[in-house]
Amino acid sequence: MLLDQLSLCSPDYAHINAILSGSYETILNTNNALILYSNISHVYAVETTNICESLLQKLYQLSPRLLETTNETLFQQLSCQNQLPFEHKYKCLQFTFPDIAGKDSHLEPLHSADLPYVIDTYESEAYIRQLFSHNRLMGYYVNSVLIGYIAHHIDGSIGALYVKPEYRNKGYASAIVKAALSAFADSPLFSQVIEDNTVSIRLHEALHAAKSDVKICWLYDDGFSF
């Protein structure tokens, strides 16, 4: 079965390892195709060594609104079809972290007074409000002033890292990541970075995070929901 062939300890499949650590369904697991569905994040993780018509028909039948795969050919094929009208499509690199977590009292649940600022600096107000309501949005405060923020996404990854412009290049980004790894240590953590986000990639490299050899390809309509 294909699932048994994946190196789940590799950064390439950290997203699948996260799905397996929670509530999920195995939709398909053959020698050349795998479809997992997370009951938590509602994402379909699809892997295949052979893109056949039966696999495509299965995906059309499932009609996923949130799909991820490391197969770039499948990504391109699904990007061009009309049966699954994905609104958003992008590729990212995936990282796993060494033992750098450090408890930091500066990181705490985002204060409600700072929620409008976060909404203004993130692409989706609805998703930010969901993260906030589920205590998955953390602020980094120095002398009660918000320096930056980070999120624990519903798929298990940490991301949406943001440092206010006036506080950049002062080491806060690294401090926020390390603090988040400690704060969310009860689940397998990883991060995903859009392939052209060179600033974030350099940050992960400076933290000696292990980088995937493949790209994680995302297709989605309305994104995560709780």
Describe these PLM feature segments.
Residues 1-4, 106-117:
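A short beta-loop-alpha structural element at the N-terminal edge
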Residues 1-68, 72-77, 119-123, 127-132:
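N-terminal charged segments
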Residues 38, 127-165:
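A conserved beta-strand-loop-helix scaffold within acyl/acetyltransferase catalytic domains
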Residues 51-59, 163, 169-183, 198-206:
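Conserved acetyl-CoA-binding loop-helix of GNAT-fold acetyltransferases
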Residues 61-73, 184-196, 215:
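Conserved GNAT acetyl-CoA-binding A-motif
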Residues 73-84, 195-213:
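Conserved active-site alpha-helix within GNAT-family acetyltransferase domains
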Residues 85-98, 192, 210-226:
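Conserved catalytic-core motifs of GNAT/GCN5-like acyltransferases
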Residues 146-148, 173, 213:
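A structural microfeature
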